[in-house]
């Protein structure tokens, strides 16, 4: 499937490791939200799983104008707290995939070409390497607000 929309909403994370699955769960909730509503034609939702940094971020398309990355981010806040980050303010060392490859590098390069924002949720628990599926309660409760933040970013009123 070509990722050829103007606005991409990319959920990153691994559903096998508790709160690390926040991004994919938000994408699933967005798809559910738009089942009975008209989604803007210029917007695409992508569950990138753990492949976001390796594939989606490094394969820019000429159509792209904006990318909204949804993921867990370590920052000083209570679990379940959401924050919109500019790529330049992602705390160093706090936003890495399971192989400790810094995600900020391809995002910084991509942000030179298009508008990139990160909707970050403070995780309570990432269970890796132990497989434990399901979000913790505070992170699960953050999904509706994350959806509202994304709707605001793509210019859709609830």
From Swiss-Prot:
Q: Name one Pfam family in it.
A: HycI
**GO BP, sorted A to Z:** protein modification process; protein processing
* Keyword Oxidoreductase attached: no
**InterPro entries cross-referenced by the UniProt entry:** Pept_A31_F420-red_hyd_d, Pept_HybD-like_dom_sf, Peptidase_A31
* Disulfide-bond pairs as recorded: none
Show the GO MF annotations: aspartic-type endopeptidase activity; enzyme activator activity
Alphabetized, the UniProt keywords read: Aspartyl protease, Hydrolase, Protease
Keyword Transferase assigned to the entry: answer is no
NCBIfam families reported for this sequence: frhD, hydrog_prot
Q: What else is known?
A: Does not copurify with the active FRH.
Which family does the similarity line name?
Belongs to the peptidase A31 family.
Q: What is this protein called?
A: Coenzyme F420 hydrogenase subunit delta
Task: State the gene name recorded for this protein.
Answer: frhD
